[in-house]
Amino acid sequence: MGHYDVVPVEEASLKQWEYPAFSGFISEKFIHGRGSLDDKVAVIAILESVEKLLNKGFEPERSIIMAFGHDEELGGNKGAKAIATILRERNIQAEFILDEGLVITDGIVPGLKAPAALIGIAEKGYATATLTAKVDGGHSSMPKKENAIVVLSEALVKLKNNPMPSQISEPVQFFINDIGPELSFVNKMAFANQWLFEKLIIQKYQATNTGNALVTSTSAATLLQSGMKENVIPMIAKATINFRLLPGDDDKTVRDYLKNTIADDRIEISMSKDFSPATSISPTNNKAYQDISKTIKEVFHNTIVAPSLMIAATDQKHYTGISENRYRFLPVQLNATALKGIHGINEKVGIDNYQLIIQFYEQLIQNACFKTP
C-alpha cells in the first residue's frame, strides 16, 4: 500500500527549501521534494520492484494486490476506503497488508546504538472535539472581568496542565520486550523490571514529543475562532482539539476527560463524527510478521527489528476485516534531522536509501510468495 497525494507547503516556507518543493530535483545524493518520504517514495518503489521482478520472469504463487490511495492526507475516504469496500464486496482476505508507517531509526531510540526498524502493529485512534465558550460580550471600552476568549483560554490551559493518563500499551510493551536486551545496562535493567520501574520508564518516554505520544492519548489545540472587530468583545469563542488515542481509549473517554478536566458549564463540548478508534493489534508470532522482519534483516544489515505503535493515522484504518495481519512500515533509514522533512521543510530521500527501498519490496514479495525467479 501507499498513497500519492501529499500535504501542501506553506507559501511562507518556500524560500527555505534547498530546491523547489515540488520539483522532484535529483542532486548528487538525494531526491528532493514533497512526497519523497511521504509517501510517493513507497508507491514508486513498489512499482519499480514489481517491474524488476517481471523483467526477471518472476511468477508469484499467490495474488499480490497493490493499493494506492489519492487522498490519504484528507482521510482516505475516496481512495483507501473505496478500495477496501471493493475488496470486501469480493470477499478477498489477505494474508497480510503492509502500508506506510514507522521507519528505520538511526540514533533516535535513546540508549540504542544500532539502527532500529520499527514495525507498526497498531495505530492510534483519532478524535476531534470542539470547545465553545459562550459569555456575554459588549464594548471593549467597558470590559468585564471575563469574556468568551478568556474562558476558553482558561479551559485550554487546564488541558495543557492535565493531560490524559499515560500508560504502556500492548504494542509499546512488545517494543520494550524486543528492544530492551539491546540497550545499555541501566536501561536494560529498568525494562526487565517494569513492576518496579514502570513510572520511571513512562517519565523517560514523556521527556520527548515522540516518546510521550507512544504512552499517552495526546491532545492538541489546532484551530481557534473568535471575534469580528478589535473594539467588540465577542460572545463566542471556539477551539478545535485533535486527539490521538491509545488502544482502549474512545470518544467517550475523550468527552469524560474534557468534561472533568475543564469543569466549567460555560464550555460546551461537541465531538466530531469522524472518530476512529485505535486499530486492532496485529500479531508478531506469525509468518506474515516474520516475512517482513526477515526481509528487513536481509536488506538492512545489522538492524534490530521490533514492533511498536504507529502514532499517526494511515490508510490502514479502512482495511478492517480484510486481514488480521496489518502492518505499518516504510523501509527508509532516517535520523532525527531527516524525520523533520516529513510534512516539513527540505523533505528528501537519499538515492542509496531509495535503492534499498526498492530492494526491500522486491525481496519481500519473493519471501511472501515462497518462490524466487
Regions picked out by a protein language model, each given a short descriptive name:
Residues 19, 61, 92-93, 113-114, ...:
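Short, solvent-exposed loop/turn segments at the edges of secondary structure
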Residues 1-34, 55-60, 241:
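Acidic/His- and Gly-rich active-site-bordering loop/insert found
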Residues 112-115, 132-139:
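Flexible glycine/proline-enriched surface loops and loop-helix/loop-strand junctions
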Residues 105-106, 168-228, 235, 247, ...:
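An extended, acidic, His-containing surface patch that forms the Zn2+-binding/catalytic region
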Residues 77, 81-86, 141-165:
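A short core secondary-structure module
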Residues 4-5, 159-163, 259-267:
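A common structural junction motif
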Residues 33, 37-118:
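Acidic/histidine-rich catalytic neighborhood of metal-dependent amide-processing enzymes
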Residues 146, 254-262:
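Short amphipathic alpha-helices in soluble, non-transmembrane regions
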